[in-house]
Amino acid sequence: MSLTKTERTIIVSMWAKISTQADTIGTETLERLFLSYPQTKTYFPHFDLHPGSAQLRAHGSKVVAAVGDAAKSIDNIGAALSKLSELHAYILRVDPVNFKLLSHCLLVTLAARFPADFTAEAHAAWDKFLSVVSSVLTEKYR
Amino acid sequence: MSNFTAEDKAAITSLWAKVNVEDAGGETLGRLLVVYPWTQRFFDSFGSLSSPSAIMGNPKVKAHGAKVLTSLGEAIKNLDDLKGTFGQLSELHCDKLHVDPENFRLLGNVLVTVLAIHHGKEFTPEVQASWQKMVAGVASALGSRYH
């Protein structure tokens, strides 16, 4: 599965808008994840997960920054996220099912904040893009 | 499986009261067919599904979407007995329509996204969590009589 030219254009142009709110988007995405899918909290026993916690904010920023890196190198996401891919495969070992859950929560956050931009076509492009990102992050699992 | 708290029920029913079932139905089904094109396999008789605009403007898609969401509206009145409410529809989807229950999960998540688009800030993480419970309950109920 690879992104068409049109899909790449949609992602890159929306990212320019999104990047100004990157930090709060990250925090909101994680809040949505932990509330809708409480089992995902099992990966963060060492975190204070209360809304507004500094750790949540920091981690949310990290996650969205990585999505941004993928968007900025959309022609070679594998190379851009290679280190992160190894981290997830050898250290974090987050079960692959969770990437879908996080992707969904990020989509919902974007839909809520950018309703006019989130057309059916944009929705499809983002779903596919996050699916590609997820594949890259799990490709070294076994 | 899904036990809805008083807060869940309040979040679900109050948001639902603001939903235009026809518009939301068409948009939800349309987006399912655009974002997950393989779901078009069930709709050969619907005419043109050749582009996002063709799909979103297709009158059969809109009509069927409205039908689906109307049914969901019935479920919202019976949150404590989703299995009972959807028993017959479950049999229909298995025996006559041959729909893989995974499609119910996909549709549920598309609905959640559509609600986020139309309700923005009001669709808080807490409200979303209640709705995720709701769509998961519906998906489970619709799959409950598969054999």
UniProtKB/Swiss-Prot annotation, chain B:
Quaternary structure note: Heterotetramer of two alpha chains and two gamma chains in fetal hemoglobin (Hb F).
Family the UniProt entry places it in: Belongs to the globin family.
Record-listed heme b binding positions: 64, 93
Cystine pairs: none
Alphabetized Gene3D superfamilies for the sequence: Globins (1.10.490.10)
Positions bearing Phosphoserine: 45, 51, 53, 140, 144
Protein name: Hemoglobin subunit gamma-2
A Pfam entry, by short name: Globin
GO cellular component: blood microparticle; haptoglobin-hemoglobin complex; hemoglobin complex
SUPFAM superfamilies linked: Globin-like
Chain positions with S-nitrosocysteine modification: 94
Primary role: Gamma chains make up the fetal hemoglobin F, in combination with alpha chains.
Residue numbers bearing the Phosphothreonine modification: 13
Domain called Globin: residue spans: 3-147
Gene name of the record: HBG2
Alphabetical UniProt keywords: Acetylation, Heme, Iron, Metal-binding, Oxygen transport, Phosphoprotein, S-nitrosylation, Transport
Organism, as annotated: Sapajus apella
Domain of life of the native organism: Eukaryota
Tissue: Red blood cells.
Keyword Nucleotide-binding: no
GO terms, molecular function: haptoglobin binding; heme binding; hemoglobin alpha binding; metal ion binding; organic acid binding; oxygen binding; oxygen carrier activity; peroxidase activity
Residues with N6-acetyllysine modification: 60, 83
GO biological process: hydrogen peroxide catabolic process
